[in-house]
A protein has these predicted regions:
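Helix-to-loop junction immediately C-terminal to a conserved catalytic motif
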Residues: 18
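Conserved ABC transporter NBD signature motif
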Residues: 26-34
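Conserved ABC ATPase "signature" region
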Residues: 34, 85-102
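ABC ATPase NBD coupling module
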Residues: 35-51, 77
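Hydrophobic anchor residue at the start of the ABC signature
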Residues: 71, 121, 149
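Conserved ABC ATPase signature
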Residues: 107-111, 115
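A short, proline-enriched helix->beta-strand linker immediately N-terminal to the Walker B motif
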Residues: 126-130
């Protein structure tokens, strides 16, 4: 877990791990490989292995795409499953994240914040990552929904063998979710 006050660089660290930002110094290793000096094309093979769950589920989902298209986009690009199995695979991921299959053809604006964050989680998990960077995944949600999402993340971590870099300003949340 990564804990710190607002503005201390927690999100920058998460995005730097993904090479969305270039570091000023230091090195980042993943599975024994140093990532900071990899080119864009060399980094491509890590795009499915490392995923990010954004802080704000309201702005991180494309409004003109259906839930099914949002989750399946990377599945198709990275050939996670054969084309004829994509819809069924995506619906299985949706179920794991607490989203009924009938949400497949609906749009993000039709959902609450908690449901949108479940869509974001499903999108991240759809490519079978080894590492998921959770950038304050509950800070934009109502307190009543925060516990549900944290419990979902913990359950998915245990059932799928996920490793999280959990970023938060709330020490108790990080303590609960981390090993």
């Amino acid at each position: 877990g990564v804990v710190g006050e607002s503005g201390c660089g927690k999100t920058t660290l998460g995005r730097t791990i993904l090479k969305l930002y270039h570091p000023d110094g230091g090195e980042i290793f993943f599975n024994g490989e140093e990532l900071t000096h990899l080119s864009k094309s060399q980094m491509q093979k890590y795009r499915t292995k490392i995923q990010l769950i954004f802080q704000d589920p309201y702005s991180s989902l494309p409004p003109r795409m259906t839930v099914g298209n949002i989750i399946s986009e990377a599945v198709k690009v990275h050939h996670i499953v054969p084309k004829d199995e994509v819809a069924m695979y995506v619906q299985e991921i949706m179920k794991k994240c607490g989203l009924p299959p009938q949400y497949y053809d609906r749009y993000p604006h039709e959902f609450s914040g908690g449901q949108r964050q479940r869509i974001c989680i499903a999108r991240a998990l759809a490519v079978k990552p080894e590492l998921v960077i959770c950038d304050e995944p509950v800070s934009a949600l109502d307190v009543s929904i925060q516990a549900q999402i944290i419990n979902l993340l913990k359950e998915l971590q245990n059932s799928m063998g996920l490793t999280y870099v959990f970023i938060s300003h709330d020490l108790s949340v990080v303590k609960y979710i981390t090993d």
